């Protein structure tokens, strides 16, 4: 930005009066030195001067200021203000440790409250906060029926002595798997239902267990796959035939013949 032709310069202070000759001298001695480095060294040298050494330059600065006020009575120092381009930083850069995208209404409801509200709830009513967190987690990972069962269990156990017992995954895993036994996605991931399996009558249809999740080993997926058959029945046999190969010559020894031989 170029200055106007009628621009009035600011009167020099004591340091500027002293450094005017010193700057010229230092620039002649060090022609490759940058002007900013020269100013830095001159400032350090000025601070080392005593009051007696600074007095002549202070008096000269006062005289120049008086002359400046006489020549320009309406002068007013107006420094140029740089535009503020820096954006204001948020108070909380990362309010939640993960993004709440999708249909996680339970976690969205928690994120709408501020950090102070959550802190007050944890300090004043820890059992209510623990129950709300358990219900929100159930709404995310289970269907509404399982979520309702988990919320009821959380509300029932809210008056226990330990308000944070709801976060114990090992103690609550059996309740979650029992309430989610009717989830239809168990058949879509490759596990047969217990009512339609080959050994449904043998196992009694009440076999329910969990499998570790492939993406998160710490999370267990409830499953209704059938268990192993009883030892009294012979499992069905299957043969893998490759091109150029036939049925194996040796048949497996049947269990019925083995029992008759005994």
UniProtKB/Swiss-Prot annotation:
Q: Which InterPro entries match?
A: HMG_box_dom, HMG_box_dom_sf, SOX_fam, SRY-related_HMG-box_TF-like
For this protein, the record's CDD domains field holds:
HMG-box_SoxB
* GO CC annotation: nucleus
Tissues and organs where the protein is expressed, per its UniProt entry:
Expressed throughout the developing central nervous system, including the olfactory placodes, with strongest expression at the boundary between the midbrain and hindbrain.
Q: Which UniProt keywords apply?
A: Developmental protein, DNA-binding, Nucleus, Repressor, Transcription, Transcription regulation
Residue numbers of the DNA-binding region are: 8-76
- Tell me the function of this protein: Acts as a negative regulator of transcription. May function as a switch in neuronal development.
Name the UniProt record assigns to this protein: Transcription factor Sox-21
The species this protein was found in: Xenopus laevis
């Amino acid at each position: 930005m170029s200055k106007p032709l009628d621009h009035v310069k600011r009167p020099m202070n004591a340091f500027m009066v002293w450094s005017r000759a010193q700057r010229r001298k230092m620039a002649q001695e060090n022609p490759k030195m940058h002007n900013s480095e020269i100013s830095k060294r001159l400032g350090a040298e000025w601070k080392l001067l005593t009051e007696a050494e600074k007095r002549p330059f202070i008096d000269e600065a006062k005289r120049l200021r008086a002359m400046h006020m006489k020549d320009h009575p309406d002068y007013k120092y107006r420094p140029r203000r740089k535009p503020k381009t820096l954006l204001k930083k948020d108070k909380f850069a990362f309010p939640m440790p993960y993004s709440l995208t999708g249909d996680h209404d339970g976690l969205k409801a928690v994120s709408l409250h501020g950090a102070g509200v959550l802190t007050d709830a944890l300090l004043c009513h820890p059992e209510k906060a623990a129950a709300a967190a358990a219900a929100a987690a159930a709404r995310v990972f289970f269907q509404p029926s399982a979520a309702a069962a988990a919320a009821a269990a959380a509300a029932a156990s809210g008056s226990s002595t330990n308000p944070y017992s709801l976060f114990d995954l090992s103690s609550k895993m059996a309740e979650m798997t029992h309430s989610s036994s009717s989830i239809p996605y168990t058949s879509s991931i490759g596990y047969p239902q217990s009512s339609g399996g080959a050994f449904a009558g043998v196992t009694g249809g009440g076999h329910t267990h969990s499998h570790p999740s492939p993406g998160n080993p710490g999370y267990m997926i409830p499953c209704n796959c059938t268990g192993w058959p009883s030892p009294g029945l012979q499992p069905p046999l299957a043969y893998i035939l490759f091109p150029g190969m036939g049925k194996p010559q040796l048949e497996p020894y049947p269990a019925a013949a083995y029992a008759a031989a005994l």
